[in-house]
């Protein structure tokens, strides 16, 4: 799956013609403001806005340097990284989601493992990088905090003829472990499929200890081309033991030479068309006999296969395959399971976590299996404990959350209705509907409780993906619903309850039989052309924004006026131009003007400089793209659908976003806006380069006095960095900053200005 850029803290500087510039600042509720209480089945969720879990990988690392091993989760759906701090005692499972550490990690790619390669007790980071393996050293200290340093962009191995990268297809997860017990980390990966009817495991032996006496990752050789003397059959979910063909027929001997053709096969490994779609492998002594076994998952297979070592660690030969592992409840997902080891309950024993490794093709709700190790330090015994580990503390409605704020029961409190792609079913389809969280708090302190995961039984209708908007579509005074869908159609639900009564929504089929805008329609309602009739403005795939002109107030009827509202071409702004757009036209403050705000599933949020009544208006100004290249893992990685409403009666609208993983996040409006910002000359400070790596310059007017300068990150945390002023140029030395998005606040002659930059 392509890397999706993440949703981070939103800092929008919105410039509008005829207005002073507004600084709009939205923050997660976990920062500087008490968290919103979310209740499910009588239990308050610990991490409601963590964003959901779909196809995740799990690693153990002391994130906050308190001596306890925490959990790092990397989800391939949305390239989302999450950190969970271990706050449990001995024999206790208790983890706390903490967004402060998410953006301390580098860009991961498709897979991630954390192992201590240099023996300093700190887990280092190995991850996918262009079909190879990148390594980041954990250089965290009490003064630095959590910090990683790139050691090598692609780990190499040497032969007598070549030195090349160890190729790992992005869909695979290799095993990085001390295979032979010599004190450094080796690498096991599935090999090139062209040489056998299946795939052997190749062992890349780490010779750093042998050559230097110190553990490292400097010297790898290909030690065995058929480690374990077995292959995984390409034609089915089968492990073939004691395979007699090449290269296993060589007696599992050491091989450090490659022919040119074999070398080329290695280079092309990541793009092979004749190999299966992906494999995962985990090396561990699962039987307690001192020999390394291997647990294998495969794309297209629902179970994991434990191959047991009947020889020794140097000359491993697998002589038995267990297909129902673990025995207490065998790992079984629709496809492509992966497994990870770590001590979850603080008893000193490694536990087992299993999760699907492919997005959009497997379970997305009960999909994180935790097996606690009830054995001992020598002989592990994994017992099933939980099917929703960590996910049970989050809002998670399967996949593709599309939230809306609405007062469904007309009690004056704003509730949350969430449409979604839905829950994955065993036949490969999705059960799509509406999930309702009712506000049981007060007007100033919202508190939400799950009422149903299938509001009004709408999943039985068969609509694939609900993306709802609520408004009075027939001018009878009550609130109706129109929903978009994955097929690009729109569906009408009439509210027959009457004004001021709890909703009674009834599906009216074939209302919009000729209204199809493509795929993944996501509407909002607004009288855009100011003719007194509500229109629909809908995002869809490829970032298109459609204007559907309303024809009548008495009954919902719309005509597609343009599929490119304002000639906006968001595809040119994104790395992956197939994403979907979502639109909200709302006030951000009680006395505010209406704002045209839009986002996409990648997590970017934009605003137009103005609302135009002419849908064919061209050359509109799209202000302040929030570039989150660095913030792939910050916050909820949302933007799948957005909505805004003042849920705490403070005169400011809060922002809710859905995530591809079925989660949501709510952001409080921290703006003291509209805030007038004095502008210099042409309404901007001249600053450059942006993005930047080590130096950032800001030009100020000649002969002006610089009173103060502060640099903060998106959390509002001040960063002490050196700067100098020569003539009218401020020079900021930013090399010490971690990659990210920063704001510079400047005071010149008692006037306040701001600038922003992205540290690469």
Which sequence ranges carry the predicted segments?
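Low-complexity, intrinsically disordered short peptide segments enriched in small/polar/basic residues
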Residues: 1, 7, 394, 514, ...
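Bacterial Sec-dependent N-terminal signal peptides
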Residues: 1-26, 675-677, 690, 741, ...
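Short amphipathic alpha-helical "recognition" segments used for binding
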Residues: 6-7, 442, 658, 760
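Intrinsically disordered, low-complexity segments enriched in Ser/Pro/Gly/Ala and basic residues
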Residues: 12, 16, 142, 258, ...
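Beta-propeller-forming repeat regions
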Residues: 21-677
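C-terminal outer-membrane/trafficking sorting elements
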Residues: 678-760
